[in-house]
UniProtKB/Swiss-Prot annotation:
Membership in a protein family: Belongs to the RecO family.
Functional description taken from the UniProt entry: Involved in DNA repair and RecF pathway recombination.
Protein name in UniProt: DNA repair protein RecO
Cystine pairs: none
A Pfam cross-reference name: RecO_N
Gene Ontology annotations for the cellular component aspect, listed alphabetically: bacterial nucleoid
Key words of the record: DNA damage, DNA recombination, DNA repair
Entry-linked SUPFAM superfamilies: ArfGap/RecO-like zinc finger, Nucleic acid-binding proteins
InterPro entries, alphabetized: ARFGAP/RecO, DNA_rep/recomb_RecO_N, NA-bd_OB-fold, RecO, RecO_C
């Protein structure tokens, strides 16, 4: 029997029987795995807390006929504020859904693992406006997946002047001379462009200090949503819930 030892983040867990739970684990060393915690629904079971959503733990797991099974576990990090705060919980749920969907089973991605862990730690410890954190996380995630939007020059010709449009299909900001090249190019407010660039580049800690007018956030939301749809061909249900809780 082959045993795997790895640190992992619990992205989500569900009931699989009257006594057991199955968890989606994002493991540091083996990617996304489905693992069963036998007896996790029993209050006295050693696995009762082993697959609580968003925890980070060290696991020993083994492969069965249909699933992996948890043999041992040891807690590394528990996010108490996420459990207590609905806004933080909504952001953590968004992180969980996005990572669950962009990752294929058993696809190791160490950079994405540590990005996910860091993002959850930021949600836990910082007090950033919900929509602003969500936008920044999404831009950082899609960039890590290889679709970083060009925001400081024209995505078509490379010029840094007159960036008056945005095109998801062309990959970012577009100058006025190239906008007809991109069929989906839409006018881009300079303040929105500056906001998007800041969200992409700034560390999460810096986001606590900014306040942005609602009209700018609304336009940024439209651009990011369309960009994600174009490049990932996905919408995320948990986003709507998080946005409803935004300040």
């Amino acid at each position: 029997m082959r045993f795997l030892k790895t640190e992992a983040i619990v992205l989500k867990s569900n009931l699989i029987s009257e006594k057991d739970k199955i968890a989606t684990l994002f493991t540091r060393d083996y990617g996304k795995l489905q693992a069963v915690a036998k007896g996790a629904r029993r209050s006295k079971s050693r696995f009762v807390n082993a697959v609580r959503p968003f925890i980070v733990a060290n696991y020993v797991i083994f492969e069965g006929q249909n699933y992996y099974y948890i043999d041992q576990w040891e807690l590394v990090k528990n996010f108490e504020n996420i459990e207590k705060d609905l806004k933080k919980f909504a952001l953590a749920s968004y992180i969980s859904e996005t990572i669950s969907r962009v990752l294929e089973e058993k696809q190791k991605n160490t950079k994405l693992y540590f990005f996910t862990k860091h993002s959850l730690e930021a949600v836990e410890s910082l007090n950033v406006e919900t929509s602003i954190f969500l936008f920044s996380y999404t831009l950082k995630l899609i960039s890590l997946l290889g679709y970083m939007p060009v925001l400081d020059s024209c995505a078509v010709c490379g010029k840094k002047e007159n960036l008056s449009y945005f095109s998801s299909s062309c990959g970012g900001a577009v100058c006025k001379d190239c906008n007809e090249t991109c069929k989906d190019a839409k006018f881009l407010n300079k303040k929105v462009l500056k906001f998007l660039l800041y969200l992409l580049k700034a560390k999460y800690e810096k986001l606590e200090r900014i306040s942005v007018p609602g009209v700018i956030k609304e336009e940024a939301d439209k651009i990011i949503t369309e960009y994600v749809r174009t490049h990932l061909e996905m919408d995320f249900k948990s986003k709507d819930f998080a946005m409803k809780l935004s300040d």
